[in-house]
Amino acid sequence: MRYVWELRPVDGGTTPPADLRYRPRRLARIIAVMTTLGMVVDTGPPPKFPMWAVYGVSDFDSAGRPLGGRAEDYEAALARILSHHGRTDVPGIPLHKLRTSLGWHVTAAECAAAVAKFDAWPGEPPAAFGSQLVPFLRAAGAGDGFEVH
C-alpha cells in the first residue's frame, strides 16, 4: 500500500495533478519529523463521516458519486468533514489527515502554515523530507491544497 498526496487542481482545472507517493514506514518518518518541526498538529480524533443513509443515498455510481435522495447534500457534508481543521486553532496540518488515506483535503492554509514552520526552522532541511516534499507543500499552499489517498 502507498499513500498518495495529490495536488488539487485550482479552479476545477483538468490538468492531471502532481502527486507524491509514500510507503507507510517512510510516511511515518516524515510525519514524525514534521511533528518535531511543528508543521503537523494533533487536533484530536478525526471528525465523524456523514452517514449516507441519513441523506437518502441509495447507491453509488461507478465513479463513486452518491445516487438518490439528497446526494448533493451528502457530498457537501462529506467535503466539509474532509476539509475540517479539527478542534484547535493551532496552525499546521492536522495529524489525522496524514495518517489515513480517506481522501482528506489538506487545505492551502494548512500547507502554508506548515511551510512557514519549515522556513522558520534554523537547522538543515531534514533528510527524511527528500527533495520533493517542501516544493510540493509550497505549491499546495499557493493552490488549493492536496488530498491524501
Which residues does each PLM region occupy?
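Acidic (Asp/Glu-rich) sequence patches and key acidic residues
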Residues: 1-149
